[in-house]
Amino acid sequence: MVVSRDKAPSAQETFLQMAQAAGLRGRLLITIGLLILVRVGIFIPVPDIDRQAFSQAINDNSVIGFLNIFTGGGLSTVGIFALGILPYINASIIMQLLTAAIPALEDLQKNEGEAGRRKISQYSRYIAFGWCIIQGLGLTVGLLRPYANNYGPLFIFQTVLAITAGSMFVMWISELITERGIGNGASLLIFVNIVATLPQTLGQTIEYAQSGGRQSITAVVLLMLVFLVMIVGIVFVQEGTRRIPIISARRQVGKKLYRERTSYLPLRLNQGGVMPIIFASAVLILPSSLAGFATGNEGLGGFGEIFVQISNALRPGTWVYTVVYSVMIFFFSYFYASLIVNPEDVSKNLKKMGSSIPGIRPGKKTEQYLEGVLNRLTFLGAIFLSFVATLPIFVEQATGVTTFQGLGATSLLILVGVAIDTAKQIQTYVISQRYEGMIKQP
């Protein structure tokens, strides 16, 4: 997308126009209402389960606690939204990898327009549905079995049905927020789930500081300072762009001669935004969930022990977790950059518009230049994201403050990233409303 030098509205102008735009108010109300609905649904219980005993077991298991944060406490409350949006995110990862690997799916996404994208979305829903059943069955048989009041085929059926229906409903809410509300539905749901667990985490941190004396207070303050520096760094990465100058050739329309003008092609330092972090976290959560489902399930035999060993190796704070997490961030950063910006398509579009990059020949040379710039930007962005994501792990180990369960960095990255992306969407909507108003003026 080529942009000119038009000045973006300030934050004050944005919020002033938000108050005046009925359409934006409606979108915000829809988004807030749907998010509240999902939070309420978390506390609708699955029947015939000793929830108090199960919740205590979850609190004592840091591996499942890692998964519980991303469901906003839905797993510990054993609600119908126990799996939350995670099956849909896992399905999206699978579908995007398949799209990149299978030419027919890639052609469907790129060349079939809106109809093709709808088919891809439909395939993602089918995968999410199957994934819900698998995870629901694993949750019921592996985790909930010791806490069931009347365990049997009927209990398994009704529990899997309730959890699957709940997760599919959350998926529908996510798509509804994306289409009718403000922001990305899946990202906002994870954002709200993390925010919901923050009071408990902060309370535990304050309790740790109060009980440990001056040394503990110093450790907590140091950790908070690291988080503050991280916020500044995250904003820098999310907002950082490389502006490539674009020169449009002179052209004559009728008797008017339009002179050569310069605009810019902005390439973000972090093209994928917060999605590489969310997807990397979802991949790392998968072994934890499989280990939780395998615990106490004798039917899995040796596989259950393998799942547990993999989960222990990928426990937050271990060197294996740090390395795998960084590799996943790199992979999804490059993967998302390739999906969002296609140098070949950009080069062709510039050539069609009669535009070019100064000093670069149109066509293949422009494509190679853009590809090189994009790769360098993505590499720098991925390094910074990996550093920011793993730094608090070492700080926690040095200070002894482990109340964030190794998820503080990931949570902070998601919270700040989603907040920035949502604010940008609101600003874009305000700008579009401004131009629509100018066009409608007589």
From Swiss-Prot:
Record keywords: Cell inner membrane, Cell membrane, Membrane, Protein transport, Thylakoid, Translocation, Transmembrane, Transmembrane helix, Transport
Gene symbol of the encoding locus: secY
Predominant location: membrane
One of the GO biological process terms: protein transport by the Sec complex
Transmembrane stretches, start-end: 29-49, 69-89, 126-146, 153-173, 182-202, 217-237, 274-294, 320-340, 377-397, 400-420
Gene3D superfamilies reported in the protein's UniProt record: SecY subunit domain
Subunit structure: Component of the Sec protein translocase complex. Heterotrimer consisting of SecY, SecE and SecG subunits. The heterotrimers can form oligomers, although 1 heterotrimer is thought to be able to translocate proteins. Interacts with the ribosome. Interacts with SecDF, and other proteins may be involved. Interacts with SecA.
Gene Ontology molecular functions: protein transmembrane transporter activity; signal sequence binding
Subcellular locations according to the entry: Cell inner membrane; Cellular thylakoid membrane
Family, similarity comment: Belongs to the SecY/SEC61-alpha family.
Record membrane topology: Multi-pass membrane protein
Cited function: The central subunit of the protein translocation channel SecYEG. Consists of two halves formed by TMs 1-5 and 6-10. These two domains form a lateral gate at the front which open onto the bilayer between TMs 2 and 7, and are clamped together by SecE at the back. The channel is closed by both a pore ring composed of hydrophobic SecY resides and a short helix (helix 2A) on the extracellular side of the membrane which forms a plug. The plug probably moves laterally to allow the channel to open. The ring and the pore may move independently.
GO cellular component, as recorded: cell envelope Sec protein transport complex; plasma membrane; plasma membrane-derived thylakoid membrane
Protein name, UniProt field: Protein translocase subunit SecY
Domain of life: Bacteria
InterPro entries reported for this sequence: SecY (IPR026593), SecY/SEC61-alpha (IPR002208), SecY_CS (IPR030659), SecY_dom_sf (IPR023201)
